[in-house]
Amino acid sequence: MKHTIYALTMFALAACTSPQEEAIDRHALVTRNNPEVTAMDSLSSLSVGNGEFAYTVDATGLQTFPEVYKNGVPLGTQSQWGWHSFGNPENYKPEEALVEYDFSHGHKELYATQPKEPGRAKEASDWYRVNPHRLHLGIIGLELENEVRPSDVQNIQQSLDMWNGIINSRFTLKETPYHIQTVCHPERDMIAARLSARQPAGIKFHFPYPTGGHCDDACNWEANDKHSTTLVSEDAQSAVLKRTLDATTYYVTISWEGAAKLREKSANYFVLTPTDSVFTFTCQFTPQASAAPILTFAEVQQASSGHWQNYWTQGAVADFSQCTDVRAKELERRVVLSQYLLAIQCAGSTPPQETGLTYNSWFGKFHLEMIWWHQAQFALWGHLELLDRTLSWYETVEPIARQIAERQGFKGIRWMKMTDPSGTEAPSKVGSFLIWQQPHLIYLAELLYRANPSEELKKKKKNKKKKPAEFMYSFATYEEEHDRYVLKGAIPAQETLRAAETVNPPFELSYWHFAMQVAQTWRERTGMERVPEWDVLIEKLSPLAYNDEQLYLAAETAVDTYKDIRFTSDHMAVLGAVGILPMNQLIHAGYMKNTLHWIWDNWNWDKTWGWDYPMTAMNAARMGEPEKAVSALLMDKRTNTYLVNGHNYQDGRLRIYLPGNGGLLTTVAMMCAGWDGSEGNNPGFPKDGKWNVRWEGLQPLP
């Protein structure tokens, strides 16, 4: 399958290219956007990784000052497999957090929510929200004398070479020049570093206990009695440590070149002290003891360079260097950095958390309504294998998703909102009532097929269309009085609305219409007949509700949409109905354009999220307003801030937000390559002569 996807991707790169005289200089494009850091700035940390594992460093090139960065972009060491649960001595069970609701679907529904009243149900809910949580696998940094402060690190010259996946860090410490190179292996959870200094410092390996916090660096340094780090084996050039945290264990394999001595400084704290002025080491994290051969720094560096050069040369690119609009340079920077960040943070064997593999948000769990924002772009930018790798996870948790649908009285499978690799549904007073994650798998599988229309892929993805569609049909309610289908009993993507009083949210209606059509088309592709009942649903879905001013409402029941700030804050999901999704029979183009203009002028933009700007831009592009599309992507708002490292800053809690990066890439692909029915090259950019965007390999949206 991998070889088939690769071959067709190469064909697509040749076919899906903007008109231009010569090939884009990809090396120049990538390297001119390499981030550079010249100060100990807690929001400017840099990362290396491979989608399964990531390691984030401060200005020293290692994790020397984690406390300084704790409230910025933390110095994380995280993986897809590294999870931990606190003990459950009370033997709480998931079903104890279930609460019965009646949303007039004709049956009772059980939801994993958050009871307010003290008692066992609330305790069970709290336990399953916190557990399991993602681990910080360990701090690897310079071991400095106690009196050394971050301000003592001077003359900082640090850069991330994205073409090769290596961080180069130069600085002076007490007048001693340091040069540290940091790299990650592309297929192992392993970092490698090379240190050059006249009087080299030691390397610390300091291991925390988890906090179980909602949003933090996952490092509790005050609980050494609750975990242990033992030296399992050691020789002149390597050592293996075993980590034990309650029922969780993992292994840390350290190897080095040259003379060095490993000592245990204190509980869960080891120091490796070299004697040579040039010193290299590697450190690998594994869930079980590893028998894999030990690698040198040079071998890891070579593997990294080959991996990243393949990534940049085999995928799609967009070059803004011939644009004369002053905003183009910044847009290109955001695009290239987002391509790098999403490959290291959001391309693993499980869906990514919103803060990737950098630090914990929502306890390190991932949100399935966000996977479209994180990963749809991989199908559009020529990295089908990265999207396909994650989608395989859905098959492993399908039995749990089926149980959720069954306990709520629906057919098919209902994907959980907030979860972990096991698929356990985390209780939530909001998330458990969302439904817009249900069509994502249909959409993402469709993007894979459009980029690689093979028989093998059709067979592989058939069930990914059928079973979610069965739930979607079952969830819709037929109203005989009005001869229509409605969607109700859900919190929409605009989460300021309430499940019990919301009927026909606009984005969900449009998404139901699109996904059910795709599901029917997929049946025909695979030699199956269309489901007649599904066609009736498609035909009789309620059109989007609007007011007397011909503005679309946040829901049919939200009649005060334009009078109540609750309805004009958070996600302007109505724009996603035409933007993320194509125009359909439920929508009047003129009314949607009116709605875009009102939102542009009046929305509570200070209460938005990073993906709201790409969503607005996609709507503007489809509505024939390319200047608004560009302006939305670069709107000067806090939650549309992109840091020096490319991360999308939101606020003091979410200092990085990868759905914003993913949305940016999806939108730029659409603005360049277009969408079904668009005309010409770069249809989402203004035709004022200032946006000569050159691109290669991008795919259009439906």
Each PLM stretch: what is its role?
Residues K2-L8:
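Sec-dependent signal peptide recognition
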Residues A14-A15:
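C-terminal motif of bacterial Sec signal peptides marking the signal peptidase cleavage site
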Residues S18-K365, L384, Y394-R402, G527:
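Acidic/polar, glycine-enriched structural segments that form the non-catalytic walls/loops
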Residues Q63, E67-V68, W83, H367-Q403, ...:
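Active-site core of glycosidic bond-cleaving carbohydrate-active enzymes
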Residues K122-D152, T521, P659-P700:
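Catalytic cores of secreted or luminal carbohydrate-active enzymes
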Residues T350-L357, T477-L487, M528-E533:
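Short, glycine/acidic-rich hinge or "gate" loops at secondary-structure transitions
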Residues P351-A376, S392, K458, P468, ...:
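Zinc-dependent metallopeptidase catalytic helix centered on the HExxH motif
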Residues F471-W522:
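Acidic/histidine-rich catalytic neighborhood
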